[in-house]
Amino acid sequence: MAYTPRLKEEYKSRVISALKEEFGYTNVMQVPKLEKIVLSRGVGAAVSDKKLIDYAVDELTKITGQKAVSTISKKDVASFKLRKGMPIGAKVTLRGERMYEFLDRLITSALPRVRDFGGIKATGFDGRGNYNLGVLEQIIFPEIDIDKVNKISGMDITFVTTAKTDKEAKSLLAELGLPFKKN
């Protein structure tokens, strides 16, 4: 039998039935699921130093285990000395098994390394069932060697779900193990 990530097994065995019971779904296909996780990182100083983009791409690749791509500007912004087509950030989109593996590492090893961590805020939902989480330091991930970090910077992590409402999405992510703060 092929390898399946722990969280994917847990989703199939426990989370689906819990969400069906909570929201009264009649069909398994109605149950919301995690579609993709997008990690993105803006590098504003890359206008003057091109190597910063390479560092950002390299760090996102180490964190996720999948090659990150650099993002480019769509238009000129004179006040930032930015031209159309210049690299300004990095992003990586995780789907399938890599997505579940990353979520497992985020929950079990990265988030507990955050200083004074008491759970994540539930204010990051967008009204359509997606959740945005901001990470202030990339060094919370065990894949990043603190001694080799060029500059401490954060990133945005977006959880895209098939849920129609924020309540469904929050229940899904909480069942998968994301530690939300108690109100």
Curated annotation (Swiss-Prot):
NCBIfam families: PRK00010.1. It holds the Pfam family Ribosomal_L5. Belongs to the universal ribosomal protein uL5 family. One of its GO terms (molecular function) is tRNA binding. GO terms for cellular component: ribonucleoprotein complex; ribosome. One of its GO terms (biological process) is translation. The keyword rRNA-binding applies. Part of the 50S ribosomal subunit; part of the 5S rRNA/L5/L18/L25 subcomplex. Contacts the 5S rRNA and the P site tRNA. Forms a bridge to the 30S subunit in the 70S ribosome. InterPro entries: Ribosomal_uL5 (IPR002132), Ribosomal_uL5_bac-type (IPR020930), Ribosomal_uL5_C (IPR031309), Ribosomal_uL5_dom_sf (IPR022803), Ribosomal_uL5_N (IPR031310). This is Large ribosomal subunit protein uL5. This is one of the proteins that bind and probably mediate the attachment of the 5S RNA into the large ribosomal subunit, where it forms part of the central protuberance. In the 70S ribosome it contacts protein S13 of the 30S subunit (bridge B1b), connecting the 2 subunits; this bridge is implicated in subunit movement. Contacts the P site tRNA; the 5S rRNA and some of its associated proteins might help stabilize positioning of ribosome-bound tRNAs. Keywords: Ribonucleoprotein, Ribosomal protein, RNA-binding, rRNA-binding, tRNA-binding.
